[in-house]
Amino acid sequence: MTFSLSTICTHVVLCGVLLVLMSALTHAAPCLDKPGRIWVMTGCVLLAVRMLLPFEWKVTKTIYISRIYPEVTCFFNQTIQLPYLPACPLYMVLLCFVAAISTVRLAGLALTQYRYRRYLRSLPVTEAFTIVNRLGRTQKVRCVTDPHASNALAIGLFKPQIVLPALSFTEQERRLILRHELAHIASGDIALKLFVEIVSAVYWWIPFIGALSRQTNAALELRADDLVTKELDESQRLAYLSCLLKVAKCSRRTPSPFAVGLMTGKEGSLKARFRYVLEHPRTSPLFHVVALLCIVMMALSFFVVFEPYHIPDDVRAETFSPRDEGAYLVLREDGGYDLYVKEAYMGMLTSIPEEIQSLPIKNYKEEKP
């Protein structure tokens, strides 16, 4: 396992491309059925794990690039001298700068979470529930009403809470909201949301990193909608959608980045949720094929690294390629071989290396003056 400038460049390029592919995939099919949601969530988790492992392994396949890339790596590999610090490559200085910003972002997220949880502890508990999560463990969930909240949300990895806004809900709407948030808690969505937000905060410098959080949120909300509405009749589904619309009209930014809210997304996401609840459309087979290809690309990206390929001019003058015109071998009487390039004698070989076995071989008598 090695870490170098090449692994960093590979990491940035591949993760950026994969993020674009995943974003385009979910944009083309915003209303996902259960298999589609599984593909998207699997892709998001794999992509997040890929971001955490910017290394080169023993089984890594090297892909050499000879244009532009050598100049880029040469620029970032140049040694610079900062005051009071030892000389080091430019990319190491930039990495330290990026790490410092990532640390500040993580600290900011943690502080926001701590302050909001402390505020919630000051609110009276209106209801309490006991649920069984996906791991078969019993969890106690308490519910509070926040007069300043504009969105219903679930928060807390080990001590989950449901926060309700101080809006005028009917008893049926209140039950539906609670079922939605309890579905998030029982499915482990808070843990997945926490993981994705931490990765996004650390790798803020990866192009299109915001797509990772948006795709995860969309898939989690559709899954919760499915768990809540799959056993409801049409009138109850309409009541559920009316509840979503009521919250969406006054919804603002979620007070904690680690919370899973009833409303997370823009107008397009809300339309997709309405369509899913009312129609339960099926994702096209083409979506599954493309999603599978994206997953395979993510898995293969763990074992690929881009390396610059550059031969200095002074070295190039003393080397040749088997594809060069005028290169050939001459079979000697003693069984050896003479190597010629453009009629210039290069040296004698006792055997033919694999790299030049494609060169034409002439008889010694043909070349003898």
Map each language-model feature to its residues.
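Hydrophobic alpha-helical membrane-insertion segments
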Residues: 42-60
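Juxtamembrane/interface helices at transmembrane-helix boundaries
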Residues: 28-35, 83-166, 307-312
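Short helix/loop segments within enzyme catalytic domains
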Residues: 124-125, 211-272
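Active-site recognition of the HExxH zinc-binding catalytic motif
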Residues: 175-196, 221-226
